[in-house]
Amino acid sequence: MPSPKSKSEAAPDLSEVTAIYQDLEKRVLPRSCQISTRCCRFRLTGQVPFLTLGEALYAAKGVRASGRKEIKPNPEGACPLLGANGFCTIYQHRPFGCRTHFCEAAGGVYPRKHLADLIQRLEALDEKLGGEGSRPLPVAVGDALQVRRACRR
């Protein structure tokens, strides 16, 4: 993972990620999460969320806030951010895909065409931060934890 473009910063400014997520929260999505965590079971579903650099850095902030310095693979193939209690350990910092992906029981995936403007903002931020496009969650967050650690030095 590339480091953020401005190495002089103590840490990348993630306020745009926060703004994008706040804009998403203002939209009424005709879906209702059933909290089954099926979508968090990557091996079971065969689907892994992809994160831009901004999303990964924001998620890494949540990982650190939960008291961890790294993420470890889940032996059952679930999201490494899924807690033993079945809840997301970084819920407030969860990625865009986790905020917009809904299983069939909840109404299915929300059409991306209704979220295209927010996705474009995440992609523009990725470019601004020096990212190279979306990457699988475990890799992106793991690398972001390394970047955040380097920025603190």
Regions found by a protein language model. Give the residues of each.
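Short loop/turn segments that flank or connect secondary-structure elements
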Residues: 1-153
